[in-house]
């Protein structure tokens, strides 16, 4: 257990807390006319002079202290400042970009007016109102599905992934590598943190240039104890996230961002197993890329893809998303919503963006849109991080409801000033944002009604809905049902081809059922958006019977990044 220092409160300047952490020093006390300074590295003349200037020119004496102790002291003594900045830093910087409030004042007025108008029309012309609603929903459903189809089809023609060869990695000198920070927010993960320490301990990067910051909530003593029992290497730092609200992953990450020393920074989840050379590949990819590229996204896939039907569908979805959809968005220079993990950032650019929005439960998607609005771009690096796919239905619904609720939040936040966003990113990119971020939850909300209406109308001979719906409405529903599902089945069939996992292709025919599950989750998401918008529905990890260390047989030709065992 790391014991924090007890610095003199008069010497500790809260406004310099980021400087203290990133530069690795801290004023402790006055001793015989000098200021004793805790420092993580011996003071060079240049660094000594810089610290003296920061302390008003007073002479200093050094006290070598591990970086972990310096960070622990800061987060302990300045916990109120860290908690406040992590929760409300973005809101103070730009209230309009924060999901702290679900609706702005003008949005509330618009919603009330729309509800009143719809209620009046529903009373006076109920059937006409219902038909208009179905017609509008049909347009949104089909437009969003067609958008995804054509973007993915476009992406299938290109390979824009930053490919890095082994010879390039071998040519890297440790002395030339930049400092890299790994952030790992964990909460109630005592059962898997030992595996986490092993997985991140395999990263091929000089430990003198690497800091792994594990962010643990203040009340989560069980996880903190489990980390200590796993005996992590010295470059692992456990940072206590001060109590506060909202208790979300992005809030914890904001604390980590304040103490991060790396030129580059990556987020991993507790169950992640990145390829060992991922950091080096990303350094090379950033060196090649235009300065406007501030994020590199590594691919994600699952080590337990073959566990059951649900995990197979997960793997199909991720294969299509990372191999085709992201590439298609990049080709068209459209906004790219980030994945929740394996995002590699230029740290300074991330700070300029205001970090993560702690009130948005899909902070990754929101950050991708904010980056795009400032002219930044997202790149893709050819490295895969293996994760645990949710294998239990209840956990899946909870996880997807959080993701869909976050898309709803992101759409509402960036709809507050639509004309400003259009000026920033252009009309075409705004349209793409609308179809992807707003269209996705709206599409899922429409799946159950469209499916039910279609089945009742065309597959139940005894049901006659002609008294309520003209044939044209019913045929539109059938068209949506057939075309929408056919396109998504086709896209999911495309996913495994690039990876050679042909054994997954047939499972894509179950996508209509998979979408029904998403539709259930979307209604839960909508309810939570109204009742508890900032609630973070945690996904339980460590539930799978599959592990990276205990491979199981996979069909011939299944590549390591999509097979059930990930066989590494």
Label every PLM stretch briefly.
Residues 1-54:
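Polyanionic, low-complexity intrinsically disordered segments
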Residues 178-181, 211, 351, 366:
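Cell-envelope/extracellular polymer assembly enzymes that use nucleotide-activated donors
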Residues 368-386:
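Catalytic donor-sugar/metal-binding loop of nucleotide-sugar-dependent glycosyltransferases
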């Amino acid at each position: 257990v790391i014991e924090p220092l007890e610095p003199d409160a008069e010497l500790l300047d809260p406004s310099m807390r980021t400087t203290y952490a990133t530069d690795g020093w801290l004023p402790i006390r006055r001793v015989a006319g000098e200021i004793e300074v805790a420092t993580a590295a011996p003071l060079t003349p240049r660094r000594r002079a810089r610290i003296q200037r920061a302390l008003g020119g007073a002479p200093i004496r050094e006290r070598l202290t591990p970086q972990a102790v310096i960070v622990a002291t800061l987060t302990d003594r300045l916990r109120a400042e860290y908690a406040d900045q992590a929760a409300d830093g973005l809101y103070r910087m730009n209230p309009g970009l924060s999901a702290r409030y679900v609706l702005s004042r003008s949005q509330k007025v618009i919603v009330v007016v729309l509800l009143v108008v719809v209620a009046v029309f529903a009373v006076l012309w109920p059937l006409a109102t219902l038909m208009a609603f179905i017609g509008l929903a049909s347009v949104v459903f089909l437009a969003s599905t067609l958008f995804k189809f054509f973007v993915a089809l476009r992406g299938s023609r290109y390979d824009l992934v930053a490919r890095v060869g082994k010879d390039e990695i071998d040519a890297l000198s440790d002395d030339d590598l930049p400092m890299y920070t790994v952030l790992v927010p964990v909460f109630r993960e005592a059962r898997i943190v030992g595996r986490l320490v092993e997985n991140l301990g395999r990263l091929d990067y000089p430990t003198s240039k690497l800091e792994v910051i594990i962010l643990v909530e203040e009340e989560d003593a069980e996880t903190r104890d489990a980390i200590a029992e796993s005996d992590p290497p010295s470059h692992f730092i456990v940072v206590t996230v001060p109590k506060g609200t909202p208790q979300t992953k992005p809030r914890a990450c904001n604390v980590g961002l304040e103490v991060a020393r790396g030129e580059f920074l990556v987020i991993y989840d507790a169950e992640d197993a990145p390829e060992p050379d991922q950091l080096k590949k990303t350094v090379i990819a950033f060196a090649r890329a235009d300065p406007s590229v501030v994020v590199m996204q590594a691919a994600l896939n699952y080590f337990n893809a073959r566990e059951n039907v649900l995990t197979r569908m997960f793997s199909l979805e991720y294969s299509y998303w990372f191999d085709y959809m992201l590439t298609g968005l990049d080709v068209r220079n459209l906004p790219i919503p980030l994945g929740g993990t394996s995002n590699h950032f230029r740290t300074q650019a991330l700070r300029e963006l205001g970090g993560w929005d702690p009130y948005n439960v899909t902070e990754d998607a929101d950050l991708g849109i904010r980056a795009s609005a400032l002219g930044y771009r997202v790149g893709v690096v050819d490295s895969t991080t293996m994760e645990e796919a949710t294998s239990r239905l209840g956990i899946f619904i909870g996880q997807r409801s959080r993701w869909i609720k976050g898309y709803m939040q992101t759409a509402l936040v960036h709809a507050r000033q639509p004309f400003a966003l259009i000026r920033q990113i252009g009309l075409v990119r705004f349209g793409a944002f609308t179809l992807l971020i707003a269209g996705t939850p709206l599409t899922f909300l429409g799946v159950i009604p469209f499916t039910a209406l279609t089945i009742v109308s065309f597959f139940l001979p005894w049901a006659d809905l002609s008294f309520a719906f003209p044939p044209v409405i019913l045929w539109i529903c059938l068209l949506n049902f057939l075309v929408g599902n056919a396109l998504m089945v086709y896209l999911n069939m495309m996913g495994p081809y690039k990876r050679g996992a042909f054994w997954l292709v047939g499972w894509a025919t179950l996508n209509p059922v998979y979408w029904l599950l998403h539709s259930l989750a979307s209604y839960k998401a909508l309810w939570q958006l109204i009742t508890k918008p900032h609630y973070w529905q945690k996904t339980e990890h460590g539930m799978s019977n599959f592990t990276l260390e205990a491979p199981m047989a996979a069909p011939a030709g299944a590549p390591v990044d999509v097979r059930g065992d990930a066989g590494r």
